[in-house]
């Protein structure tokens, strides 16, 4: 079970891209080992062509950073790869000493060298799954979504932490029991087709299950013929085993077929038998689009189990978060750095920065995000002009708004100063934050482009660096 423990019990210090080590060794050899540098982690493209991404993975990132330590075995491995003794001595005595700021988990977002890999790994994966889960939850229009994807996840960590992220995104629970043990994500589940197949008859299987679990009896009715045998046998089992003992059935589940059609027929059969309170659960390779269509077609489904298309975010399986240097300190002064590309979208934004979210004071809805220099303060008692950083003639004066900083400090001088909230609190916070977004941002198809703007001072600094490097390129 150690391998399935939380990050608190695992030393993942060497889970790095190898070039992080070669660069760190080079910095030390070139007298740059004590240089203070600033890095940004951000993304450029929203999965599934959506309008937002949900921040997740912060707790695991904190656990990783608190546990950074190179073991003697790590040192010997690196010695065998030809790293200098000076660098190995540095790693043997290594202590994490950075300041880290992050957007809290559950926040919708729009758009230290060797920690790069794990920073991206923790945040990219869980943010991707939390976002996909939230899309699916919203498609269900209040009907509970259960995460059923463990067996289809890409590795056991993806199953475990994917279930955690799905819960943040709004899922009611998971089939992954270890995620309940580790994080308190409610474990849910009933039976598989193998239960029915193991008995001589479907009715016998249903009756045995009802006797064993009378207070949580959900029967899988599509092993043989859903409408001709499955639903009728479920009704008979309910009458034989539950009603005489004072119990009511919890539900039936379909895992195949035309579920919109089957659920309508089954609902009628259950109601006629006096089981109006018996719920209908649907699974079978579902996603937000299929769920939306099923509901639009009048499906009588009360909850959904969603597996592979959630836990892998199969329609958009990668969140392309990146990690870029944005400034270094020289002689006590923060000097901005920029990364330039022929692809305009890949030009980084320099400087030590602070992100803000502007909310309409009357509606509570988010107006735009604003990225400023770290020492800038937004006075929300005064009108503020925001503008598109690419199409600068697009400008808007914002009034009657509230400006809130988006980030919290996680680490100060290498010490964790942030207390990660309980997962249920993160889930509630996520739902509250999603409610601050306009429907136009939340729609699945061609969502409104939520504005992420730069302050005038930050935009000016970016243009200055672009011009400066442009002149260097001409020489």
Predicted features along the sequence, with ranges:
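Residues that form generic nucleotide/phosphate-binding pockets
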Residues: 61-68, 77, 81, 90, ...
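Gly/Ser/Thr/Ala-enriched C-terminal appendages of enzymes
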Residues: 2-35, 39, 44, 48-53, ...
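Buried, small/hydrophobic-residue-enriched core segments of structured protein domains
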Residues: 2-38, 44-47, 82, 88-97, ...
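Low-complexity, highly charged intrinsically disordered N-terminal segments
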Residues: 38-79
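An N-terminal, globular interaction/scaffold subdomain
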Residues: 63-65, 102-104, 109
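Residue-level "edge-of-site" marker
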Residues: 193, 283, 307
